Amino acid sequence: MSQNETLPSLHPLFNLVVSRLLSFGYQLLDGDNDKINYSCRFVSEYIHNFCNIYGPLPKRLTFYTVDKISGDFLKSKFMTGNLSFNDIDFNAPAVKSLTEGDASASFAVDSSTNPAKRCADFIDLLAAPDKNVLYRFRRLEW
């Protein structure tokens, strides 16, 4: 980058995305700000293009967009092997069912769901675009 070029400003959703990542127990590392900012721009551009929206995103898409940005960022960290959480234990068995009267609980213990698979499923849930949400905001382009 030359001296005349400036770094891109932080995306308006940047702070919300950082808060969301911290709520998952992710600790920010050096260099994450640029990656988060890139994910903000990437996901926002996808939504703008899919919905044919010119101008700012509708406020009702804010938290949807924050989750998609968080998922995109975590997916890139996971795929490069640079992801670790402090608060989420993917080794713990997931609860399959829970009954309150006469207290019974069963856990979803399956050999096909190892911690890495659970982590990937969690990230996919965040990152996968729910087009039913986006269809509500889609506009025709003439």
Where in the sequence are the language-model features?
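Conserved short "hinge" loops at termini or chain/domain junctions
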Residues: 1-64, 117-142
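Short loop/turn elements at secondary-structure junctions
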Residues: 3-9, 71-142
